[in-house]
Amino acid sequence: MDTTRLKDFFTGLQSRIVAELEAFDGQPFRTDSWVRPEGGGGISRLIEEGDFFERGGVNFSHVTGKSLPASATAVRPQLAGRSWEAMGVSLVLHPRNPYCPTAHMNVRCFVASKEGEEDVWWFGGGMDMTPYYGQREDVVHFHQTCKDALAPFGDEVYPKYKHWCDEYFFLKHRNEPRGVGGVFFDDLNEGGFERCFELTQAVGNAFTKAYLPVLAKRREMPYDERERDFQAYRRGRYVEFNLVWDRGTLFGLQSGGRTESILMSLPPIVKWRYDWQPEAGSPEAELYEVFLKPQDWA
């Protein structure tokens, strides 16, 4: 399979998103190109201590290999003995202001090949938002943008991917969701290659429309140490999910991926507290009681 068209889309998407984020923040992203000795490489774009973003990364990677790691063949035995390539864009953004949510987006494609046999391929991706102080209109906007992006592919797609997102970004050991969700899909190959590629493009292209208006609305909201402290505590959940449950992180580390790029998703300042509970009736309690309850936002 010729994957040039895929690569052109993913690298273009990375460039467009970074340009919008640089315009929003005012500071440039660092560019770090890297080569993977086992095959492939990527471009990491990173901001740390920006005017608005405390830390953020927008990664493109295109990695190849002769055989797959255990995390992949355990769930898909048919992939054993196949060479593979994985390609995509992954980003996580951590604003400094606690009233501005963290966001994650990922779009990717995977192809596994064996001489004399048809390629096995699929797309995956999605986006989700993790507020610290929830605002209903922000969550509705984020979900409505996701819904609109997926509407051309059928009315059933958004509800299915929204539910999948709620299930995937869930901390089983805490019995709570990571945030307010969004959309998530994986192993997508039904309907043919073109439809799957178009759907993946639609998700990637919708990200800044879903997220930047939320940030623009909240970026000037005043905050103090109380809000920063709660933000750092809740960021701990983000770290727990990424290191314990996230399939992409585990695949990257097990397949000899670039550790600096894989762990770029982690926030810079995080706190843990033993058995901490929010004060009844507080804005912090509202996050748990209202926003960390999966519901129909759009």
Swiss-Prot record:
Residues of the region (Important for dimerization) are 238-273
Concerning Gene3D superfamilies, the annotation shows: Coproporphyrinogen III oxidase, aerobic
Q: Could you tell me which InterPro entries the record lists for this protein?
A: Coprogen_oxidase_aer (IPR001260), Coprogen_oxidase_aer_sf (IPR036406), Coprogen_oxidase_CS (IPR018375)
GO BP annotations of the record are: protoporphyrinogen IX biosynthetic process
Name the chain's protein.
Oxygen-dependent coproporphyrinogen-III oxidase
Q: Which Pfam families match?
A: Coprogen_oxidas (PF01218)
* Highest taxon, organism lineage: Bacteria
Q: Which cofactors is this protein said to need?
A: a divalent metal cation
Keywords of this entry: Cytoplasm, Heme biosynthesis, Metal-binding, Oxidoreductase, Porphyrin biosynthesis
**Swiss-Prot/TrEMBL site (Important for dimerization) positions:** H173
Tell me what reaction this enzyme catalyses: coproporphyrinogen III + O2 + 2 H(+) = protoporphyrinogen IX + 2 CO2 + 2 H2O
Enzyme class, spelled out: oxidoreductase
Described function: Involved in the heme biosynthesis. Catalyzes the aerobic oxidative decarboxylation of propionate groups of rings A and B of coproporphyrinogen-III to yield the vinyl groups in protoporphyrinogen-IX.
Q: Name one GO molecular function term.
A: metal ion binding
Q: Which SUPFAM superfamilies match?
A: Coproporphyrinogen III oxidase (SSF102886)
Please report which protein family the annotation says this sequence is part of. Belongs to the aerobic coproporphyrinogen-III oxidase family.
Q: EC number(s) on record?
A: 1.3.3.3
Assembly description? Homodimer.
Q: Where in the cell is it found?
A: Cytoplasm
Which species?
Dechloromonas aromatica (strain RCB)
Task: Tell me the residue numbers annotated for binding substrate.
Answer: S90, N106, V107, R108, G256, G257, R258
Which positions are tagged coiled coil?
none
Residues at which a divalent metal cation binds: H94, H104, H143, H173
**Annotated pathway:** Porphyrin-containing compound metabolism; protoporphyrin-IX biosynthesis; protoporphyrinogen-IX from coproporphyrinogen-III (O2 route): step 1/1
Q: Where is the active site?
A: H104
State the GO CC annotations.
Answer: cytoplasm
Q: What is its main location?
A: cytoplasm
